[in-house]
Amino acid sequence: MKIDLTRLVTESRNPASEQIDTLPTLDMLKVINQQDQLVALAVAQTLPQVAQAVEAIATAFAQGGRLIYMGAGTSGRLGILDASECPPTYGSQPEQVIGLIAGGHTAILKAVENAEDNRELGQSDLKALHLSEKDVLVGIAASGRTPYVIAGMEYARSVGATVVSLACNPGCPMEAYADIVITPVVGAEVVTGSSRMKAGTAQKLVLNMLTTGAMIKSGKVFGNLMVDVEATNAKLIQRQTNIVVEATGVSAEQAEAALAACGRHCKTAILMILGGFSAEQAAQKLTQHQGFIRAALNQE
């Protein structure tokens, strides 16, 4: 069946850039920048739906479920990017947030021919993860019609998982398979059909909110500090110290001493200082309160 791509918003021509190939470099970039400014406004219109998705993801995490991103091309890469940043930022397990791309790891760096049209692959990739009703699947596709993603969404519904659609074309096929529909309509691209641009930026903004919101609601943030950050390099070791200082008001030396006493776990160090607990007591309190510092301090 032939698909009429010209009917899709993401495939339409943008009047603002029809003569972009004739413009001086600075004027060319001004056109791109002006179009980019429309993206955040489009995302703002979807915030109620994004909030629903954040609540669903946080609930899944609390019940031992996972967040699975699924996309092809740029959409798949954006999901993988967001998923890969969760462990170092929030100390989460790598299997808690997973990014799938049509064509597998090879497709991260190089296009895999026909992978996005492979429905069987969409289902088999999720079956390999043993997707269950505890999980949340976010299907990502600028067009909203990618067969790989739609097949995955169909399968996710069949096992009772919560399904979210993230696309940039209103009324797209993906919406029919979703419990929650997020559709930032960013309009035509500067280069016709190049959905890695405005559509990709909109997707990235939404993905940022999904994981950030869910991690905040899971107790991974105290104030605006990433208190579960892992010390995997020199920069992050210093960040841990800074976080404890900011959260407690003690000196860097005192923060370092607390971190050293608890195996460099920011939450434990903060609770030790603010609550006057030993490392063991602080760790126990965090366990009792599911990792929420405020609850452990009875500040809720």
Curated annotation (Swiss-Prot):
**Pathway noted in the entry:** Amino-sugar metabolism; 1,6-anhydro-N-acetylmuramate degradation; Amino-sugar metabolism; N-acetylmuramate degradation; Cell wall biogenesis; peptidoglycan recycling
Q: What keywords were assigned to this record?
A: Carbohydrate metabolism, Lyase
The chain positions of domain SIS read 57-220
The answer to keyword tRNA-binding applying to this record is no
State which Enzyme Commission number(s) the record gives. Answer: 4.2.1.126
Family matches, as InterPro entries: Etherase_MurQ (IPR005488), Glucokinase_regulatory_CS (IPR005486), MURQ/GCKR (IPR040190), SIS_dom (IPR001347), SIS_dom_sf (IPR046348)
Q: What GO biological process term is on the record, naming one? A: 1,6-anhydro-N-acetyl-beta-muramic acid catabolic process
- Which transformation does this protein catalyse, written as a reaction? N-acetyl-D-muramate 6-phosphate + H2O = N-acetyl-D-glucosamine 6-phosphate + (R)-lactate
UniProt keyword Lyase, yes or no: yes
Q: Which SUPFAM superfamilies match?
A: SIS domain (SSF53697)
Q: Where along the chain is the active site annotated?
A: 85, 116
Family from the record? Belongs to the GCKR-like family. MurNAc-6-P etherase subfamily.
Other observations noted: A lyase-type mechanism (elimination/hydration) is suggested for the cleavage of the lactyl ether bond of MurNAc 6-phosphate, with the formation of an alpha,beta-unsaturated aldehyde intermediate with (E)-stereochemistry, followed by the syn addition of water to give product.
| Protein name as annotated | N-acetylmuramic acid 6-phosphate etherase 1
